Regions:
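Amphipathic, Lys/Arg-enriched alpha-helical "gate/interface" segment within cytosolic domains
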Residues: 2-119
Length: 119
């Protein structure tokens, strides 16, 4: 399956496919942002499989860089998939996810169905 845009309750969401380029470094962020802008999406839903492990290791600061860039460009981000193993290893990540899910710009959801219900 390819990346696609899906309209969910008035929100244009770029739903990234499970397979494809990984977001592995700060330089990769622009690829996802560019595609969102090109397709006029206001939210990007990225599966866990498309994120490098460093995203979940907060000490690498990759997650912070991703979040900052999305916020700066006024795009919302949803991370889709099971991150329970990562949360079990890191209290800081658990707190980060909990705080993100309280907000409006960055969400972590189990799957696209959960994202649909939140929007």
């Amino acid at each position: 399956m390819n990346d696609r845009v899906e309209e969910i309750r008035g929100v244009r969401v770029l739903v990234c496919a499970e397979e494809g380029e990984k977001l592995a470094g700060e330089g990769d962020i622009n690829d996802f942002l560019g595609k969102a802008w090109e397709l006029e999406a206001t939210m990007v839903a990225i599966p866990v499989a498309r994120l490098a492990d460093d995203f979940f290791r907060l000490r690498t600061r990759l997650a912070g860089a991703v979040v900052q860039k999305f916020v700066n460009y006024r795009l919302r981000l949803a991370v889709l998939g099971d991150i329970s193993a990562w949360i079990a290893e890191s209290d800081a990540l658990r707190d980060f996810v909990r705080e993100a899910n309280r907000g409006r710009d960055i969400w972590f959801a189990a799957d696209l169905a959960e994202l649909r219900s939140r929007l």
